[in-house]
Amino acid sequence: MQKRLTLLGSTGSIGDSTLDVVARHPERFSVYALTAHRNGDKLVEQCLRFAPEVAVVGDAATAAHVDAKLRAAGSKTVVLHGPQALVDVSKSDGCDTVVAAIVGAAGLAPSLAAARAGKRILLANKEALVMSGAIFMDAVRDHGAILLPVDSEHNAIFQCMPRDAAEHGGISKIILTASGGPFRTREPATLVDVTPDEACKHPNWVMGRKISVDSATMMNKGLEVIEAHWIFGLPGDRIDVLIHPQSVIHSLVSYRDGSVLAQLGNPDMRTPIAHALAFPERVDAGVDQLDLAQIAQLSFEKPDYARFPCLALALKALEEGGIASAALNAANEVAVEAFLERRIGFMAIAATVDAVLNTLPNRAPDGLDDVLAADAEARRLAAAIIAKAPAPRVERTV
């Protein structure tokens, strides 16, 4: 039976890759709703190609722009806007599958709505689990939703794990691989001079600017550890991080009998997306087959926590529990935005997050509203810290 998709965040890199896979298999997948924040022109192009029933954007002005262009082209797609519209298309009877690819905390409410509606959820939004892991996973279980991870690392672990729960499958630990980003071998003393363009030049993956910066600081890997804790039900001390510069092995599962299972593939997000879309079947993703002889060598090393303090901060937040992970995520989003706008330097990202975690008292959240309140409080603190920070050095010519 054909799957009907709501694609949250269709104009981002995950959205592009998802629609590429969808276009290859029109007999398997159709699109009910596409959503974007303010990239109206790209959304119009997608709507004209995939003919969704509904399109959602962030504000009224963008909605008017998109609607006018679609009407002029003869499209019948209904254009909505605002946070509630995101929730509505995520729980609508018009779709059975929700691809959650909105970056940041804005993706939490629609992802949670999809879980409470019992949808098949392809999760690429880390924040739903980082901010409110217990609440989200309870909703998945209580409402019969199906959760399929799309992040390459978590999808790799999913493929290497038994279908039973981890505690019944003889699993010793899971190992998330990380490329190390663009600064793995750079002299630590020079990181203070890093520019946004340098931080966004990932050596292997094509990603958006925010997640590229998170990869450069390795905050992305820290968030993935927290995400893995909730998806697979393992404590933090059974989740390792391993630097693997080639990005060929996407993650590994270590078993009690000494076996280690790994999932390999070329670094292309269409592979995990196609796996999750078609699961339990396999379909062509448009990705070249891996040529191990050409790669010839795979290398590994332990992460340098002094070089990547954001990774250490994320692991600490997971250990502390409570609202710490939500505060970590909120402070990081504010700090990364400030860095991309050249209001703070690269190393100030970790310093800002650390200051917020040390200032905001930790507590056990009392429901989703409390999580969102902690998120807002952490954002205010981060903004205040950044406002007092010294201006970054003048960007050098490269």
UniProtKB/Swiss-Prot annotation:
Keywords, in A-Z order: Isoprene biosynthesis, Manganese, Metal-binding, NADP, Oxidoreductase
GO biological-process terms attached to the record: isopentenyl diphosphate biosynthetic process, methylerythritol 4-phosphate pathway involved in terpenoid biosynthetic process
Binding-site residues, 1-deoxy-D-xylulose 5-phosphate: K126, S152, E153, S179, H202, S215, N220, K221, E224
The keyword Oxidoreductase is annotated on this UniProt entry: yes
Sites where the protein binds NADPH: T11, G12, S13, I14, R38, N39, N125, E127, G208
Stored NCBIfam families: Dxr, PRK05447.1-1, PRK12464.1
Function: Catalyzes the NADPH-dependent rearrangement and reduction of 1-deoxy-D-xylulose-5-phosphate (DXP) to 2-C-methyl-D-erythritol 4-phosphate (MEP).
Protein name as catalogued: 1-deoxy-D-xylulose 5-phosphate reductoisomerase
Lineage: Bacteria, Pseudomonadati, Pseudomonadota, Betaproteobacteria, Burkholderiales
